[in-house]
Structures are given as structure tokens and as C-alpha cells.
């Protein structure tokens, strides 16, 4: 949002800020009705008057003298009692007489009240003969312009009461969230409506402009409907209520980090839910933005993405031939290895807020969860996968890729590749049978969903490393992927530990290696940050590959827990 002014908030003042807000907000409001509503609300005279009063009081509060103490009345009483016990000189008698005067006592009492800021009136005790069934009354003030109120009313045939019959979504009443179906209408702008017909009340409403004041008796809520089932959600973004200008009370807000599990306690408010952090001993719920509200905000805040396709003409295999990956290193060709236009559009439309989750523990006999490794080129995915395979060949396995090129003499079907015709490969692409695919020298290469199913059907853990934008195709109840993001250490550690290491590059099956360059390190860091920023909400485990042995031990321990312990997964994965 553009800056409101080059002046600071204290120099501008709340009143001046209020006057420029409509013009500043206009570029960000698409609906003409919403623009009209904002102009009417900010142009309301009573609102401007309240702001002026607020500024006057604020100015006085800033320069007002600070009271020395807030017990002047009791101090004067103690002094009077002390003086009366002393010898009765003329000065003492005069002072005692002065302090005993009612107006002096009242003055000191007012002083103490102001010093303590005890402005709220003391309510009398409730009478003993109070009617428990007496209705409570709510005063509601709505600001509307020429648009309809967005609510219909009816007259109860038995009691004659005027009731709210329907709330139209998107109308002024709906946006306010203050008027509900079943509320009894008692007054409109101070005019009693008990003896009026609905048509007369509608006429009063249609003739009213600006602010409309309602006196209503809230309807009785259905207790069965107000009881909400227990719901757990995974936070897909970081949230700090202290930085949220929209939250009604910052002190009541609940902060959380991406990946935290929250228990939603109430969704009564469409904008602010009440939730608790799972596992937190604090029993008090806090306010968090609702899913719909946060999605709307992120959609407004999110900049329009600039699509950058990865260009390459070379293809690389991840150490073992069965692990299919596409290279991005050769920039001489304009041919895109990935058909990523469709997936890019999906990613920009996907606004990460919350995901409803539940606990899942793999039962004996169930298929293993698919293990997906994600990371930038050169970070060491291939080495980690190779070490896992060597550690237990009966437990871990990888997929066999498909290709449209001809089989060579030393190759066997289903060992190095699944060899299929180009026409069949293109048909499988159209039928979305590939997780990812690419083309090199006129031949297609790809990893199919069936190849993953083949590994899982053998009761083995399938190890797969893919580009992060393909994760959306794998996040299904069938695969229940456990996504591990492997990131590089800081660039200083990369220079220390990988300066003499080799990065694999290859053309077709002929692999070669070369030393890491400074450009490789910078590209690795940059790609890692991009992946984490854009897809971090999909990662269940993040491992920093500073030391390969340590990283491998951490990965193997995490995979052991996946098989033996309960984990939070999307609730949709357990409903299929």
C-alpha cells in the first residue's frame, strides 16, 4: 500500500489521517459498493466529531500535570484527626474547619477519582426480585449509503414481535456481523416498531441515510449449532499479532510459526477465530485470523509473480540411473525442460493459510509413506539417497524412469529404464501419468506415478527426489508423502567443505564431474531460499547438509520416526 504521507503519524494527526484514507484505499478496493461504503463511513460527521474529541483529549492528556498522589481525601481526614488532638490554636481551628467543609471534601474526592482514572460508574446491586427471563437489549449502529440493508424482517404471528427473517450475504448487515437471524427489532433510529407493520419499518429504513441505530433483543442461539467439533489446523505462515493492524486486540492475539499445530476453539466470528497452540499448557485461547480473512489479505498483499522458466538442454541423473532428475545447468538452448506453465499458475493461485490436519500412525501391513527429497542442485540429495539405499537394500528403493529413446545393447527393459514409444509417452503425458518429465535430444524422459506405486506395492520405502512444484501432484491420500527439504549451510561453510568436491553433470548416460565454482555456491543458496519461501509450508523436515554423515544420521532417524510414531497429516489423507 502506498505511504499515506511523508509526515509522521504524530504530525499528521488522526483527523487528517481519516480524511485521506478513502483516497488511499480506493486502488485496493474493487467493488463499487465497498468503495461507496468506505466513503460513507469515513465521511460520517459523527465519526469526525469523535475523532476531534479524541485528539483534544489526547492533547490534554499529553500536557496534563501528573498527580502527586491519589489519596488526598484520606490524607486530609487523617490530618484533621491529628490536628484535633493537638492544642487548639486559632490557626489549627481554622484549618480543621476548612478541611471539614463539604465542598473541600468533594473537591479532594474528585481529585482522587481523576488521579485513579476511576471514571466508570458504580452500578447498584441487582434487585432481589429481578426477572430471570427478562430480555437483554443490544444497541447497534450501522453506517450505510444508498445500498439496501441486506436483511429481511417478518412479524411473528403469535407474539406480534418484529423479527429478522434473513441476512443476505455481502449486504451491510452481513458485513457488520452484528445482526442475526431471529433477533427481535424494538426500535429504529429511536422510533418504537412494536406497533408497526413490516412495510412501515422498511419505509423508515429506506428513507434513512448514513448511520442507522437499532435496538434489538438478541435471538436465542441453538446450542446444538454453537457446539463445534474439535478441529486442528497446521499453520502455513508465520503470524505475530503485535504487527497486525487489523486485529481488534493485540493483547488477545495468538502468535505462531509456520508448521505449528493449532486447535481451533471457536469459529463464531467470520474474521477472527479463537485457537490454542497444541501442546501448550495455557488454557486461554487467543485470536488468529480466520482462513477466509487471511486468504483475502494474502491475495491483496501478494505481488504479481514473474514467471521464469528454467532453460536447459542437458539431462542429469541423480547418481543412480533409476533416480530421474532434470538438469538446469546448460543455458545455451531456449527449449524448456519442464512444462511448468500450468504448475506455476497453480502455485500462484494457492494461498497458504491453514490446513486441517489429524494424527496418523502407520499400521502394520499398511504401505509405507512416500519419502520425497527436495533441494537445490548440488546440495547432496543423491549422496543421501545413495547412503540410504546402501544402508538397507531390502527396505529402501527408487523408481525406474521411462524413456522414449531406443534401448541399447547393454540395457535391459525394466532395469535402467522402461522403454516405450514416443507416441505412447506423449499420450501418457496428456493423461497425466508422469510426476515430472522432460525432453533431451528429441527423446522423452520421465518418472511415472505407476513406478512409485510399483515400489510401494513391494512393501518398500520409495525414495524420490523431485522439483518442488510437483509436490502438489504427490500430496494425496494414496502416497501420504513425507517431504524432506535438504538445504545448504551458509556460503562460508560451502567454500570450506565443498571447494574440492565435484558436482555431477552429464549428457544422457555419460556422466562427468567438475569442481564447484563460486557461481555454483551462490546459485545453490539462492535456489534454496526460493524453495523455502515458496514451498516451505509443504516441508515436514528440514535438514542442513553441512556434514554429510550428520545429515544422513538425522535423515535416517527422521524416517524411522515416520514409520513408528504418529504424525500430523492433512485430514483428507485419512478419509480415503
UniProtKB/Swiss-Prot annotation:
Question: How does the record classify its membrane topology?
Answer: Peripheral membrane protein
Q: Which domain of life is it from?
A: Eukaryota
- The UniProt record lists the Guanylate kinase-like domain at 368-560
A GO cellular component annotation in the UniProt record: adherens junction
The alphabetical list of record keywords is: Cell junction, Membrane, Repeat, SH3 domain, Tight junction
| Subcellular location per the Swiss-Prot or TrEMBL entry | Membrane; Cell junction, Tight junction; Cell junction, Adherens junction
GO biological process terms, semicolon-separated: protein localization to adherens junction
| Effect the entry attributes to changing residue 556 to N | In hmp; leads to vertebral ankylosis
- Please report the stretch or stretches of sequence annotated as the PDZ domain: 139-220
Residues in domain SH3? 228-298
As for family, the record states: Belongs to the MAGUK family.
UniProt function note: Acts as an important adapter that promotes epithelial cell polarity and tight junction formation. Involved in the assembly of protein complexes at sites of cell-cell contact.
What is the name of this protein?
A: MAGUK p55 subfamily member 7
* Organism for this UniProt entry: Danio rerio (Zebrafish)
